[in-house]
Each structure stands twice: as C-alpha cells, then as structure tokens.
C-alpha cells in the first residue's frame, strides 16, 4: 500500500469543520473554489467497498463464519473483492476446502496483514525470521529512502541494519526498527545486522506476493511480466532493471503498464516448486483451427511451450 493525496469529500469537509468548531469558536475557510466544490463527491465511499478484504476474510474464518452475507452489514462486502480475498488466502495456505487451516490460524495470531504473516511463518522454516521482520516493518511504513533509494528493497534493509549497528537515534528508521523488533520478539529471534543474501529477500517476498513474481520481457529490459498477467516497469537506470527475475513488493494499481516501487532480485532456482505444467488448447481465429501446447508456467509467465499435435476439441478453452 502507499499513501496518496486525494480530494476530500463534501461530508468529510463538513465533519472536519465541525471538529474544529468543538475546540473553540471561529471561522473555517475552504481552500478551494466553488467550481472545485461542485466536483467533490457528496459522501465518502465506505472503506469496505474499496479495501483489500483478506484480513477481514481471515478474521471471519477464525470465528467460524464462512458466508459473509450471514452477517448484518451497513455496507456488505462486494462479492468480487470477497472472492479475490478467499483466493489470496488459499494461495497463502490459510484456506483449504473453504475452511481455515492450522497455518491460517497461526497467520491470524500475528498482528499484521495475512500476506506478511504468511511470509514470516515461512521465514521461520527457512531460519530467516530476522530478515522477514525487517521486510515486514519496511513495507508497513513509508519508504525511508524515497525515490533516491531506487526500487531495490535491499537498499532499505541495509540502511536499517546500519542504523542499528551504529546505534543511531531519531529519523524514520526508529519507527521501522520498533516494528521489526516487535516481530522478532513474537518469534523469539535475535536481531541480525550481518550481511545478507539479496536473493533471500526476493524469496521471502514471493511468499507474501506470489502473484508478483516477475520476469524481464525480452527486448524490454525495464519491463517485467508478472505471474498475474500484468506488466510493470522499472526505471531504465535502476539497478534492478536488467535482472531476469524480480519479486515485487510494491507497485501502483494502474491498469496497463504499472510502475514498480519496491522489489528484490530473484534466483530462478528458488522458483522451481512454483513451475506448473499446463496443457493449453485455443481456437485460432485466423486459421480456423485448434492450437494446442504443453506449457511450463509460473502463473501467466510461460517458461517453455511445446506444440501438441492432434488436440482434443472437447477440451477447447
């Protein structure tokens, strides 16, 4: 997630004026024109209609609620977003056959987003909890380096560890370290300020965001295709622009060409368990025949494709 500056709605503006009035008498000035006022939304959109519902779905599952419509809501969760949340939780191994798993219960006990909870639980198996705690803390706070730090999250991790090693005080890293420390305490893990493998950062990010595994597009060194089918771009001069594989931790939500904000390089050897063999049969609209292939894929990323002769037309997708 990222902080964005957006226009206020009319009801929010009125509410803030009222709050100021409760402190003391005075005058509230609206710092925009009447024309701008006329274009403002009348009311705020309820948060549940715009938010990622993964945390809510995990909460309800831990309470034994499988159908959100069995509850009374001021604004019911959109079914499209709810289905997407369940798919995310299934991919994070929190759900199986519509029920919460033991792994999901462990995720729910951690005070963070399910994606980060899954990452830290997997990091425990890899003996990388301290690194995962640093990653989670950095992702929960505003980027401490901003654009000057490039898109490599490893630059932030190294800066955080330097902050700790030199016992610096103040600044953005103080808050980030407090969060990281709280996660280390939950896992009873000692702080680690030693040099680390940047590819291990990428591996951990794939646990949190498996759909954001990204492969450099041939001939477009700064463009990457994600496992979810989207295309995202790094800056042409960025250190990671020429990496073959990235794990993307943060990018914008625009359709079409997205922009990568934070990522880490990936070792392709760490992706072996994610490769799936998929048989694809499609109708060729130009030739009027069937095209079939056996693909090795990571989501929408095709690693290898072998044509299949004599496809079965009953399996046309």
Question: Could you describe each region identified by the protein language model?
Answer:
Residues 1, 34-317:
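Second RecA-like catalytic domain
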């Amino acid at each position: 997630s990222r902080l964005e500056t957006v226009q206020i709605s009319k009801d929010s503006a009125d509410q803030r004026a009222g709050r100021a009035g409760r402190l003391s008498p005075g005058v509230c000035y609206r710092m925009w024109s009447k024309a701008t006022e006329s274009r403002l939304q009348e009311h705020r959109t309820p948060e549940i209609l715009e938010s990622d519902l993964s945390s809510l779905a995990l909460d309800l599952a831990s309470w034994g609620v499988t159908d959100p419509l069995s509850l009374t809501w001021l604004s019911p969760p959109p079914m499209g977003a709810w289905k997407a949340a369940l798919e995310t939780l299934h991919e994070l191994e929190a759900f199986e056959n519509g029920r919460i798993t033991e792994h999901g219960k462990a995720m729910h006990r951690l005070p963070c987003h399910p994606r980060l909870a899954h990452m830290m639980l997997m990091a425990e198996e890899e003996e990388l909890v301290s690194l995962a705690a640093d990653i989670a803390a950095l992702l929960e706070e505003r980027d401490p380096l901003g654009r000057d730090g490039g898109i490599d999250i490893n630059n932030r991790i190294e800066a955080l560890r330097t902050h700790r090693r030199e016992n610096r005080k103040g600044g953005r890293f103080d808050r980030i370290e407090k969060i990281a420390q709280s996660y280390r305490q939950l896992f009873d893990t000692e702080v680690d300020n030693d040099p680390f493998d940047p590819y291990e950062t990428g591996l951990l990010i794939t646990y949190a965001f498996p759909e954001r595994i990204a492969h450099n597009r041939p001939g477009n060194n700064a463009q990457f295709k994600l496992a979810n089918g989207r295309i995202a771009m790094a800056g042409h001069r960025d250190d990671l622009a020429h990496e073959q594989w990235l794990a993307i931790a943060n990018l914008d939500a625009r359709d079409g060409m997205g922009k990568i904000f934070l990522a880490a390089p990936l070792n392709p050897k760490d992706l072996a368990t994610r490769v799936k063999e998929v048989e694809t049969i499609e109708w060729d609209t130009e030739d009027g025949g069937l095209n079939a292939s056996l693909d090795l894929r990571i989501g929408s990323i095709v690693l290898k494709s072998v044509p299949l002769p004599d496809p079965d037309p009953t399996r046309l997708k």
